[in-house]
Each structure stands twice: as structure tokens, then as C-alpha cells.
């Protein structure tokens, strides 16, 4: 069994070596001029389709198998299995030629070129498929960013807040009603003294204040009123329109306004009396004196303006006359100096001494 097994292994190795040499010879043999450069080089086979090359290799292998009569008939079954195994190995070698060290550099270049073309086609197909997937893809984030959805959530939150406010108001109203019932029972149990105190308290309410007994209860209950609305802290509740307290309040406010107005008038009249030359006591006298004084000041101002205008005109006339007289005197003086110089020259020419120089 061991000798038979080694013989089969040797036969397989021989067949594989022959097939490798045949494949290399097929790649290196002369071929047609596919590039049109009048040169039947080995690189022309690189332009051949890889499928055609594989087909030729299979035909060559089939021819080799038919012409091989040296094998024994007894080992036909094992040879058939070896042929099938060798064909599978040959297909693997045709796909990955660059892995076998017996393949030349030219074969590697041819195989790499075909692999690059196939890889380029596959990449282009994958890119096209990815682009189609991106076109068909719908972004979920864009759907989530819909403004309508956000608005709906805000509306739900606002509705919940409003419902909570309504529940709070109902609770406040319930506490106010319970407090009113407790106050009524306390007032009924109290005697005549409490009734008088209640009457006093009602009078205080008309004036805009609260009784001492109920004020503490209102503070404990959070200031809840009869209608469930709590008044603002630090403020008295408003009085009813048309009541005596309301009328009294309006009367007091009117008096305060009148008092301030009269005070302002008196202050202005006092300042006006200080400006008058004659002091007066009554307001009417002060106002009349002030009117007369102002009228007199206006008349005096008008007279002074006329007087000052006339004086200005007269002064301008006098200035102009003096200016002209001064100009004439200057001209005469210059002429006199010229005549004097001429006389001096004539005296010198006549041999007479100048009497002005001796003096």
C-alpha cells in the first residue's frame, strides 16, 4: 500500500509540473498582433480576454489527457480521480497564478491586469448600488425634526399645565368654603360680645380693612377669598362702588388734590409779591399790582427803545461829520508842510538864513 501510494503521488506531481509548463508556454508562445504594432510579442496576449485564455488552457489539457497512453489500465480509476483533482487544482492556479512561484513575471503581470479590470468593474457596480441605496434611503432624523411633531408635544405640555392650574384653583376654592363654614360656626357660638365685635369688624371692612379675628385665618389659608382668588400681599381689598366708605375715600382724595393745587398757587403768588416794589397782603392786590407793574415795564421798555434808536442815529451823524472834518484838516496840514519846504529851499538859494532854525 505504501508503494502504490507513493507512485500515485509521483504521477500527480509530474502531471502538475507538465500542466504548469504548458500554461507558461501558452502565455509565452507567439500570438497574433492584437495591438497593431507589427510585433507579435508576448504582451499582445495580455490584451486577450481571460475567459478565452482559460478556454484554450482547458482544450490543451483535454488533448494532453487523450494522448497520454503510458498509464496502466489497472490504475485507471486512480488516474481518473487524479485527473479530476488536477483539473480542480489547475482552475485554482488559473485564478490565482501569481501565488505559484513557477509562474514568470509576464504571467503575473497578465493576471494582475485582468484582476484589476475585474476589481474595477466590481467597484463601479458597488458604487452604483450604493448610490441607488442612498437615493432610496429616507433619513429618519429628518422625519424626527418635523416642526409639527414638536408643536404637538408643546401643546400636550401646555394642556397638562392648564389642567394642573384648574385642579389647584378647585382645591383653593374648597379650602375657602371650609374656612367660611368654620367662621360661621365660631360666630354662632360666640355671645353678644362677639356679635358687637362682628359689627365693628363689618364697619372695618367697609373702610377697607379686615377684622383681627379673620385676618389671622386668612393668612393661614394663604389669603383665599370668597371667590377663590387670593388678593395680593401688602394691599387692602378694594371697597364696593357706591358705598359710604367709597364716597369718603373719593372725598378725601379730592380734598388732597385741592390742597396741593392751592399750595402751588400760594407759593407762586408769594414769589411774585417779592418782585413787586410795594408789598401787598391780599392775593388780589398782589395780582393787580403785578399786572400794573408788568404793563409799566412794557411801556418803559418801548420808550427806551425809541430813545435809544434816536440817540444812535444822532451819534452816527456826528461821527460821520467829525470824520470828514478830520480828513480835511489832514489834507490842509499836508499842503502847509509842502509850502514850508518850498520856502526854505528858496531862502537857501537866495543866501538868506532860515529864521526858524535860529530860533
Curated annotation (Swiss-Prot):
SMART domains: HLH (SM00353)
Annotated region described as Disordered, given as residue ranges: 1-262
Principal localisation: nucleus
Single GO cellular component term: chromosome, centromeric region
Bias (Acidic residues): 120-161
Subcellular location: Nucleus; Chromosome, Centromere
Residue stretches making up the bHLH domain: 249-297
Keyword Nucleus attached: yes
GO MF annotation: an example: DNA binding
Ranges of compositional bias, category Basic and acidic residues: 55-78, 249-259
Keyword vocabulary terms for this entry: Centromere, Chromosome, DNA-binding, Nucleus
CDD domains for this protein: bHLHzip_scCBP1
Protein function: Required for chromosome stability and methionine prototrophy. It is involved in chromosomal segregation. Binds to a highly conserved DNA sequence (5'-RTCACRTG-3'), called CDEI, found in centromeres and in several promoters.
Assembly mode: Binds DNA as a dimer.
Protein name: Centromere-binding protein 1
Organism: Kluyveromyces lactis (strain ATCC 8585 / CBS 2359 / DSM 70799 / NBRC 1267 / NRRL Y-1140 / WM37)
Encoding gene, per UniProt annotation: CBF1
